[in-house]
Swiss-Prot record:
GO terms for biological process: adenohypophysis development; amacrine cell differentiation; artery morphogenesis; ascending aorta morphogenesis; BMP signaling pathway; Cajal-Retzius cell differentiation; cardiac neural crest cell development involved in outflow tract morphogenesis; cell adhesion. It is found in: Nucleus. Transmembrane segments: none annotated. Transcriptional repressor of genes that require a bHLH protein for their transcription. May act as a negative regulator of myogenesis by inhibiting the functions of MYOD1 and ASH1. Binds DNA on N-box motifs: 5'-CACNAG-3' with high affinity and on E-box motifs: 5'-CANNTG-3' with low affinity. May play a role in a functional FA core complex response to DNA cross-link damage, being required for the stability and nuclear localization of FA core complex proteins, as well as for FANCD2 monoubiquitination in response to DNA damage. This is Transcription factor HES-1. Residues 1-44, 157-200, 254-280 are annotated as: Disordered. Residues 110-143 form the Orange domain. The gene is HES1. Has a particular type of basic domain (presence of a helix-interrupting proline) that binds to the N-box (CACNAG), rather than the canonical E-box (CANNTG). Residues 164-174, 181-200 have a biased composition (Pro residues). It comes from Homo sapiens. Residues 254-271 have a biased composition (Polar residues). Residues 34-91 form the bHLH domain. Residues 10-21 have a biased composition (Low complexity). Transcription repression requires formation of a complex with a corepressor protein of the Groucho/TLE family. Interacts (via WPRW motif) with TLE1, and more weakly with TLE2. Interacts with HES6. Interacts with SIRT1. Interacts with an FA complex, composed of FANCA, FANCF, FANCG and FANCL, but not of FANCC, nor FANCE.
Length: 280
């Protein structure tokens, strides 16, 4: 018996040796596995940063609005963000009002700069081929809406743009020129489907240029979101001694004005009597 026990004890280390030799270390994790394993930690850190920033923003906005923080201890995240947006808008209006009181031409400069940028975008889209027509129309319509909102912007102590005196005509008998910091040119709407002005040739467009912005004789045609088109007329075209009466062209080619008559009630006006701003 003792011999058998000694034999078993002596053989047990030898039997365990091959098992320990055959063990292999764990394979290193790939980049995707590492990102997957660390994603919960990163998400936790991200939420902690958001909550910390919102907490600081809450303290700042309550101090700026001079509100008691004890009464607003349970503000939701959306409420904090809305209060911040409103406060920043009020600050922006106050800064614009202060700037206008110092220099009344600030708003005019802003409008002139926006109008110039809009003209550059329209000119690029009019001459660039391969641009999707739907995207082009949506972009030009969005810019036209923004231009309308900017023209309607008023601040305390400043008259409405519609009540302001028209800008003086540019000096010299040359073509239409924009004076420095002049307000944006007016838009003359034309019903959808109207024929383009025959006085000028359109610039180079893509295959679907019929629905995009065009330039005829120096005047830009901007499509509106409701399917109509509008002429972008320079200020120099309105430098007349008498009042200017806009004339709209319909699909039939007849003019519609204060003295116009329908084809059924009387003879239509001739082509010479139609006012064409794109002709000198």
């Amino acid at each position: 018996m003792p011999a058998d026990i000694m034999e078993k004890n002596s053989s047990s280390p030898v039997a365990a040796t091959p098992a320990s030799v055959n063990t292999t270390p764990d394979k290193p994790k790939t980049a995707s596995e590492h990102r997957k394993s660390s994603k919960p930690i990163m998400e936790k850190r991200r939420r902690a940063r958001i909550n910390e920033s919102l907490s600081q923003l809450k303290t700042l906005i309550l101090d700026a609005l001079k509100k008691d923080s004890s009464r607003h201890s349970k503000l939701e995240k959306a409420d904090i963000l809305e209060m911040t947006v409103k406060h920043l808008r009020n600050l922006q209006r106050a800064q614009m009002t202060a700037a206008l009181s110092t220099d009344p031409s600030v708003l005019g400069k802003y409008r002139a700069g926006f109008s110039e940028c809009m003209n550059e975008v329209t000119r690029f889209l009019s001459t660039c081929e391969g641009v999707n027509t739907e995207v082009r129309t949506r972009l030009l319509g969005h810019l036209a809406n923004c231009m309308t909102q900017i023209n309607a912007m008023t601040y305390p102590g400043q008259p409405h743009p519609a009540l302001q005196a028209p800008p003086p005509p540019p000096p010299g008998p040359g073509g239409p020129q924009h004076a420095p910091f002049a307000p944006p040119p007016p838009l003359v709407p034309i019903p959808g489907g109207a024929a383009p002005p025959p006085g000028g040739a359109p610039c180079k467009l893509g295959s679907q240029a019929g629905e995009a912005a065009k330039v005829f004789g120096g005047f830009q045609v901007v499509p509106a979101p409701d399917g109509q088109f509008a002429f972008l007329i320079p200020n120099g075209a309105f430098a007349h001694s008498g009042p200017v009466i806009p004339v709209y062209t319909s699909n039939s080619g007849t003019s519609v004005g204060p003295n116009a008559v329908s084809p059924s009630s009387g003879p239509s006006l001739t082509a010479d009597s139609m006012w064409r701003p794109w002709r000198n």
